[in-house]
């Protein structure tokens, strides 16, 4: 019976797997810290420049939005573009930290006016002399008289109103907003799931 040469049986020639040294506690903590910091930075960038989920707080946009619903708000289009009339937007008011959700009614250079019909008990908004078609308003509303004299917006001034006109603190009371106060465009409601829908 043949035998293998002794050198072929030498286990010292067999490659040995290198064992990875365990990380020190300091390196482990640093790794976790960097991971968390990166996640926070990414989240801040996304919320500041891309999109943000925001909860409706209040009834100023009924029937378009309901109290407690979660909205998906996009931001890039207002960073590189301009808002349009009828957009549902997220905005900030002077000297207030919280967000507000309103509808954009008039743009810089527009003249906005509100006339009250005593027979029908409704207010009609006019922009540049034309009545604004507002199908999103409640058809059974019984408005208070919120008539307003013609107001011509200056450069970088935007006029916003809530869809629930008798229960909305908006440009009729706080004045026109500046472009820097418009945060994003409400695109859809995603919660509750049963009422998820796009916002035109």
Predicted regions and their residues:
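Soluble "head" domains of membrane/secretory-pathway proteins
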Residues: 2-29, 45, 49, 54-55, ...
